[in-house]
């Protein structure tokens, strides 16, 4: 199991992933999105880049624990699961600090 996890991480870090490009004056936009699921445990936070923001490709931009930004399609179930997990974690932390 550990070997499978190590191999999965190796493939993830060595394969090219869609990244941000500075083509929009207002904000950086994604040129494409990855269809390959990103492991949720490597994601620190996220934000949306949508057509209404001036981007041609709607995307959720995940920031990894190492600071890498990965573009993902907002309508995919795996993307929604990661966002829900991040929101639950954020809500728990806010309750603890209150």
Curated annotation (Swiss-Prot):
InterPro entries: Chemokine_b/g/d, Chemokine_CC_CS, Chemokine_CC_DCCL, Chemokine_IL8-like_dom, Interleukin_8-like_sf. It holds the Pfam family IL8. GO terms for cellular component: extracellular region; extracellular space. GO terms for molecular function: CCR chemokine receptor binding; CCR10 chemokine receptor binding; CCR7 chemokine receptor binding; chemokine activity; chemokine receptor binding. GO terms for biological process: antimicrobial humoral immune response mediated by antimicrobial peptide; CCL19-activated CCR7 signaling pathway; cell communication; cell maturation; cellular response to prostaglandin E stimulus; cellular response to virus; chemokine-mediated signaling pathway; dendritic cell chemotaxis. It is found in: Secreted. Disulfide bonds join 29-55, 30-71. Interacts with TNFAIP6 (via Link domain). This is C-C motif chemokine 19. It comes from Homo sapiens (Human).
